[in-house]
């Protein structure tokens, strides 16, 4: 993260060139003010990042691969808020390092490992989003929770390997410790040029990479959002006309027999299907009811024509008495049903009586199935468009969050790293307090990150509110 400088100025860690003489110690009022401000920032940082971690833990809506990377970043920010901020504040207020060499090295190792892990997590987030928008067909299949865990572990392990051994054991490698007891800085960073080299690798190069990636992410996201944006009236009209001109599907429904009826007979208490007649007689209006013993029928509408029932084959029953031919009123079924009319016809031939049920389609053959198919296709198309728009909205939300995080990182880390660049060429050009403020701004980035999540993601914001108000039952429904 940052680099510390001893009082004599020979080191590159100019941010901690603290005054060690009594007459340069901070006044009491100034120390109280600094302690209050930095203590408040530390508390806000700790609480904010704990809220982030709890939100991801308890709300399943936030348990995504991208948010697991944010969880890792929140862990790093929590460590900075709990330890690094307070130890550096103690160093500033006291004017010297009062905790000894061992605590100094442990603090520096922790500070640099965690800060470097933050940068690595930001790089992972940027690359992850870049591959999501540029390779939407292949990358999501490999974007699993296991892969995210491996990437997060790699970021922390690499940061530890790069900084912790060098900070803790450099004095044993060279055979002596050159850092004074009342100061705290990294021993092997004793040259401003070396410090500048580490700043290039730890800040400038990652910033360039993340900026380029974000530009590509933004362009790709805008392209996808533009593709799925709502259509204008003219576009909708043109597409509707084209849809009406091109038939969706040719109905492959067999033409019904003349009269448009299928027949079923009620015989011996059972409803059985009877074959349609081979040669139907001429139609007859329903209004002319037949009162003879040949047949009697009912119809659902006055203008619907029907044919007389054909003689149905049945078992011989000489002893069966002839039954009167009842005339039943037709029933109209549910309009949404496939059939809408029922005709009950009774025929008496000789000594047996046969009752048949005719079910007549309400619409011409093929019209209702074709309409159903069209409605199904339209429903599927609407669902697909809605899902694509929801996906585009989620992408915009994630892109906004990444932009806010990267912007906060660049704004808070740039002042210190610019001072490192200037100090390489002019070691006396930057006042000591400016160094301290610049170094503290790097810590403030850990305070800002939780606010970025809440401002750019409504689900985070609602979950934060439920946690703070102890409304635990509403956490799972926060969206």
From Swiss-Prot:
Residues 1-30, 89-105, 171-192, 423-436 are extracellular. Keywords: Cell membrane, Disulfide bond, G-protein coupled receptor, Glycoprotein, Membrane, Phosphoprotein, Postsynaptic cell membrane, Receptor, Synapse, Transducer, Transmembrane, Transmembrane helix. Residues 271-334 are annotated as: Disordered. One of its GO terms (cellular component) is postsynaptic membrane. Pfam families: 7tm_1 (PF00001). The keyword Glycoprotein applies. Residues 293-303 have a biased composition (Polar residues). It is a multi-pass membrane protein. InterPro entries: GPCR_Rhodpsn, GPCR_Rhodpsn_7TM, Musac_Ach_M4_rcpt, Musac_Ach_rcpt. The keyword Mitochondrion does not apply. The muscarinic acetylcholine receptor mediates various cellular responses, including inhibition of adenylate cyclase, breakdown of phosphoinositides and modulation of potassium channels through the action of G proteins. Primary transducing effect is inhibition of adenylate cyclase. This is Muscarinic acetylcholine receptor M4.
